[in-house]
Amino acid sequence: MIRHLLSGADVDAGTANRILDTAAEMATVAGREVKKLPALRGRTVVNLFYEDSTRTRISFEAAAKRLSADVINFSAKGSSVTKGESLKDTALTLQAMGADAVVVRHPASGAPHRLAEWVDGSVVNAGDGTHEHPTQALLDAYTMRSRLGRLAGLSVAVVGDVLHSRVARSNVLLLSTLGAKVTLVGPPPLIPVDIVAALAPGTAVCYDLDAVLPQSDVVMMLRVQRERMNDSYFPSAREYARRYGLDGTRMRRLPEHAIVMHPGPMNRGMEITPEVADSPRSTIVEQVANGVSVRMAVLYLLLGGNNR
């Protein structure tokens, strides 16, 4: 098993499937009256979040606690970081405290890789800038496999703001490794073709959403990250929704078995309408639940829970 999880490129097909299989076992814990396992008792997991997050931080906290680990939540706001403490100084502090694993979210791309050089424990990337978010890709893959029974050969359309999406990058890497066929869809300014080619050469690019829907097993809608862009990327929110938003009419062009995903948070009415988000095809709530199971599996395997 790998020591850190920093990128979708860190896992080969065997490792990814081991994580997904372990997550399926962890999912059974959620149905128990007592939702706890003693696997990581005595271990310390630190959630080191330099960016605001609700879903991801709570998901990791729930995952660690269900494995009986001790959890320390660190928020940059109100901490020594606001007084100028560097990431390295924070890392050395965590090292001195004996952290067994550090889950880090940081606005700077590459920050988790630097952190991994400074601590002895395992580092899990919970999102770094516009770079990657590997556990989101794993939970997305788990959701696809749970709903559709396989990953190899699936046609997955990833739609929207690919340029600023760490989720898209990790999904391209992981899904390609697991044999899915990925097509990126969106306005030309939001599809970084050169970066995509470097990540996974077999990834397709299309600028017409309506053309890819009939052949898609999975449609993954991405949030338009307006906080990371100016108004030059597309004319208006209304025009974006008209060209690339998934509404009920477009959803009905999908194959009968196809599912709709979104990593959250959503801009309802922009990239996805409430009708679609709340439909039986939508896996959005499932993705949240599956995130806890997948992150339990990641922490369990990284910290040697299988050897305890």
Curated annotation (Swiss-Prot):
GO molecular function, one term: aspartate carbamoyltransferase activity
Keywords, comma-separated and alphabetical: Pyrimidine biosynthesis, Transferase
Cellular component GO terms held in the UniProt record: cytosol
Keyword Transport: no
Pfam families: OTCace, OTCace_N
Signal peptide: none
Reaction(s) this enzyme catalyzes, per UniProt: carbamoyl phosphate + L-aspartate = N-carbamoyl-L-aspartate + phosphate + H(+)
EC number in record: 2.1.3.2
Keyword Membrane applies: no
Protein residues bound to carbamoyl phosphate: 55-56, 105, 133, 136, 264-265
Xref: InterPro entries: Asp/Orn_carbamoyltranf_P-bd, Asp/Orn_carbamoylTrfase, Asp/Orn_carbamoylTrfase_sf, Asp_carbamoyltransf, Asp_carbamoyltransf_Asp/Orn-bd
Annotated residues for binding of L-aspartate: 83, 166, 223
This protein's pathway: Pyrimidine metabolism; UMP biosynthesis via de novo pathway; (S)-dihydroorotate from bicarbonate: step 2/3
GO BP term, pick one: amino acid metabolic process
Matching SUPFAM superfamilies: Aspartate/ornithine carbamoyltransferase (SSF53671)
Subunit and partners: Heterododecamer (2C3:3R2) of six catalytic PyrB chains organized as two trimers (C3), and six regulatory PyrI chains organized as three dimers (R2).
Functional description taken from the UniProt entry: Catalyzes the condensation of carbamoyl phosphate and aspartate to form carbamoyl aspartate and inorganic phosphate, the committed step in the de novo pyrimidine nucleotide biosynthesis pathway.
Family designation: Belongs to the aspartate/ornithine carbamoyltransferase superfamily. ATCase family.
Name of the protein described by the UniProt record: Aspartate carbamoyltransferase catalytic subunit
Naturally occurring in which organism (per UniProt): Salinispora arenicola (strain CNS-205)
Gene: pyrB
